[in-house]
Design a protein with these regions (language model features):
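Short, surface-exposed connector motifs at secondary-structure boundaries
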Residues: 17-24, 46-50
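Hydrophobic alpha-helical segments within soluble ligand-binding/sensing domains
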Residues: 1-20, 127-144
Length: 219
């Protein structure tokens, strides 16, 4: 199965929301999830953050929505995966996301590319084509006996992405430079790139040089 960067995404959320006390995670119930949940709970408990791990084998979709509607202050949601309900019926992702948006008043982070593009504030994600390449490599290793079918797919080529314009909904106003992330939907004029700064500086130097030259000519 794909092994997403939950730690990195939680850390991103904590940097953006340093007063966070609880993180609610939605994930599937594949093998290894119990160990993952235990590790995350132990790791972030030491940092004063409570991890609430919700999976479809313990909660129906309706129960999950009820849980996240009552999330405490100073918390955020991390959507990893929720593609089936308690009866193993496939859940349509966009329908579910619309319900989550209507239900959850807290910031949403994700490791899922579709969720990021649709509604999340930010996350550490790998593009879908990179997932495909990683899965292909794993299948090749399984077929050649190099690894076992239960081995997770390691996704190392990820991107930290935050949607600038979605901050307002949650009362945030972080600026480019405060986070080492790829910002999306930045309004023009908010951020000047290093190349633009270089052009401005060069232009200013040329103007000053011209003014100095004209002053010498007049004198």
């Amino acid at each position: 199965k794909l092994q997403y960067d939950l730690d990195g995404t939680i850390d991103m959320g904590l940097k953006m929301l340093p007063e966070t006390k609880s993180v609610y995670i939605l994930n599937d119930f594949s093998s290894g999830n119990a160990e993952l949940a235990s590790r995350l709970k132990h790791k972030y408990r030491d940092l004063g953050v409570n991890i609430v791990y919700l999976t479809p084998n313990k909660y129906s979709t309706a129960q999950m929505l009820s849980k996240i509607s009552a999330m405490p202050e100073k918390s955020f949601l991390l959507f990893a995966n929720w593609n089936r309900d308690e009866n193993q019926v496939v859940v349509r992702i966009h329908n579910l996301l619309n319900k989550i948006i209507d239900t959850c008043p807290k910031p949403i982070f994700t490791v899922n590319e579709k969720v990021l593009n649709y509604c999340a504030l930010g996350g550490v994600v790998a593009q879908s084509e990179r997932h495909g390449v990683a899965v292909g490599h794993l299948v090749e290793k399984i077929l050649t006996g190099v690894t076992s079918p239960s081995s997770p797919v390691q996704i190392s080529d990820t991107e930290k992405i935050v949607y600038f314009d979605r901050q307002r909904k949650y009362g945030l106003s972080l600026k480019p430079g405060q986070l080492e992330v790829q910002w999306r939907n930045i309004p023009k004029g908010i951020f000047i790139s290093p190349y633009e700064w270089a052009a401005i500086i060069i232009g200013a130097i040329m103007i000053l040089a011209l003014m100095a030259y004209l002053t010498l000519m007049w004198n």
